Amino acid sequence: MDEKKIVYDVVLSVWNLAKEHGFEKLTDEQWDSLVEKATIERDKFKQHGENIDLLFRQMYMALQNYYERK
């Protein structure tokens, strides 16, 4: 698969996590859902190597930080 497409998929995946969980402070159930779904998404990207895995993890951490600051 083309690396540009994989990077696009990472960005889209993190965006979809944010869109699905809303833009307000998360409840405990929503937080658990976010973590569970992010773990599934990360497993999809691990196979594409360390750089792609790191990109996903860092973007996901930024999303977590966004929610923690709400």
Residue ranges and their predicted role:
Residues 1-28:
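N-terminal acidic leader/helix
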Residues 7-10, 14-17, 34-37, 41, ...:
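Amphipathic alpha-helices that form helix-helix packing interfaces
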Residues 18-25, 45-48, 70:
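Secondary-structure edge/capping motif, primarily at the C-terminal ends of alpha-helices
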Residues 28-36, 54-57:
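Short, charged, amphipathic alpha-helical segments
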Residues 43-69:
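Short, charged early-sequence alpha-helical segments and their helix-coil boundaries
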